[in-house]
Amino acid sequence: MATSKEMTAGPALPLILKFTLPLLLGNLLQQTYSLVDAAIVGKFLGINALASVGASTSVVFLILGFCNGCCGGFGIPVAQKFGARDYSTMRSYVAVSLKLAAGMSVVIALLTCILCEDILRIMRTPENIFEGAYAYLLVTFIGVPCTFFYNLLSSIIRALGDSKTPFWFLLFAAVLNIILDLFCILVLGWGVAGAAIATVFSQGLSAVLCYIYMYRKFEILQGTPKERRFQSKLAKTLLYIGVPMGLQFSITAIGSIMLQSANNALGTACVAAFTSAMRIKMFFICTFESLGIAMATYSGQNYGAGKPERIWLGIKASALMMMIYAAFTFLLLMVGAKYFALIFVDPSETEILLDTELFLHVSCMFFPMLGLLCILRYTIQGVGFTNLAMFSGVAEMIARILVSIYAVPAFGFIAVCYGDPMAWIAADLFLVPAFIYVYRRLKKQVFTNSQVTQTVA
């Protein structure tokens, strides 16, 4: 039987570290097959094909980010009820979230498929890569239900304190995706569409296996027919928490789309460099994302247990781990960025290699800002203040839009390199005072509840 784990007692640092490691390994796997995906496309299909995949990166983030944000939000009430040991309501939340996911994912898939071509036109996608970008994006949109369910099931399992099981399913998906990539591109000759098909199929199969495993192995999820019914009250709570988290990703992605659109106008070489650099950057920053996800579960459980003081201990522990890792990646990327770029393009592509190196050098200097962003935002979301956390996404969006409109036309690719760091700083300027406000409210709420309890007693 698979086991759940409470994070409401014991030293914060080892608890968070132990929970983060499987998440990190999973995210590294996810980014590894994203790297391999792009490397196979770049090496075997050429620079134009690589640019085709990269031209739609921010659009994919817009849609899938919304889905993933909703999934993370749906897991928060599960974590809170698990922390409060209200297992019946927890099971009802799980059942309702699955039904919501089914309806939402189908609607999103239909709308995005219809609008796919128009989206690429709006983004000023170069004509020489338009056909490949359209094929890749269309297949990705068709596979939205697979992605939605895979991420939701992983979120539910993590909410129960188990970050290991999602890792094993992600490992399966990563290995399968790489094998299918090679088969679809080299054997079947399906081009960039084959890369997207490989990803969608591997996620879909992993989602099915994850669902079967979850209900067979987690006895705590075995509920009654009443608990499996759709309950509108619980659905409203899930949407109230999940949709703002999804919108936060989407709002952030709007700024990324503006930035990528400005970069697309600089030509195919800049698009290819941006694609390579983003794949490498995402590989290294997934540690910050993993720490953030761990803090969402940690803070959610401790909020449910009425222990806000442990949330502050978790912030300090995760910040320490974040700074150590940020220093390590800074040294690694300052020395090795040019070698990582060679994964995607040949040494003869001098301009692309130099631009990729420049992008990574600029980004790694600001990684502590991103680490702080992830820790604070996920913590605020974990205690249920998802609407407040969403405004940090607005700050990111505004920063990227300003860079896209004013800086990129004036300074070119170097301005693109500073787009994300400026967004991280803008978000932190909002999140630091926001967290202070939330933490004070939680402490006051716990104090008030304890006074009421003493009065009743």
Role assignments for model-derived ranges:
Residues M1-T20, V78-G143, V187-V243, S299-F366, ...:
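Short alpha-helical transmembrane segments in multi-pass integral membrane proteins
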Residues P14-G75, A79, V243-N263:
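Signature of the first transmembrane helix
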Residues K18-S34, V139, Y150, A173, ...:
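Transmembrane helical elements of multi-pass membrane transporters/channels
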Residues T32-A51, L120-E127, F183-W190, S250-R279, ...:
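Helix-terminus/linker motif at the lipid-water interface of multi-pass membrane proteins
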Residues V41-F61, E127-G132, V192-A193, L234-I241, ...:
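Interfacial/gating helices of multi-pass transporter permease domains
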Residues L50-L110, T147-P166, A273-A337, L370-S392:
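Small-residue-rich hydrophobic transmembrane alpha-helices
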Residues L62-G65, A109, N177-D181, A207-Y211, ...:
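Hydrophobic transmembrane alpha-helices of multi-pass small-molecule transporters
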Residues C71, V139-R158, P166-A174, A195-C210, ...:
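Short runs within selected transmembrane alpha-helices of multi-pass transporters and secretion channels
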